[in-house]
Amino acid sequence: NGCGAGRTMFAVDIDGTLYPCHRFVGERKFALGNIWTGSDNSKFLKMINVRNRDKCSKCWAQNLCLGCCPHENYTNTNNINLASERSCRMAKTIYEKLISVYIKMSDEDKKMMWPED
């Protein structure tokens, strides 16, 4: 499922402000609401959906990297939906290597790594 920011993971600031994850604490424009008054994460989730990103929507690795970490994207490109070229290259290289290793694994090794029960 990739990053759980705003979906399965949240962070709460000392004043009750709710953020998608600990890395966004203090970045008020990414606040999802407040634990005392309510919150809405739907806008954030729509924003980080990899299928809504021009750069990622046609990428072969989109379902593996899911557009990289939203906070790292924001730090590197000032846009949570835009991964840096370096991040994309690194993710693709890692997944290419992992796929290559998986293809070379025997069925027995695959069963040992991912048991069915």
Predicted regions and their residues:
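C-terminal accessory region of radical SAM enzymes
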Residues: 22-66
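A broad, low-specificity signal marking well-ordered, structured residues that form hydrophobic/aromatic
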Residues: 10, 30, 86
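Short capping/connector residues at structural and topological boundaries
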Residues: 8, 37-40, 93
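Short clusters of hydrophobic/aromatic residues that line enzyme substrate/ligand-binding pockets
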Residues: 3, 32-35, 88
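A C-terminal junction/extension of Radical SAM enzymes
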Residues: 1-26, 115-117
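Short Fe-S-cluster ligation motifs
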Residues: 44, 82-117
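Cysteine-cluster motifs in flexible loop/terminal segments that predominantly coordinate metals
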Residues: 50-97
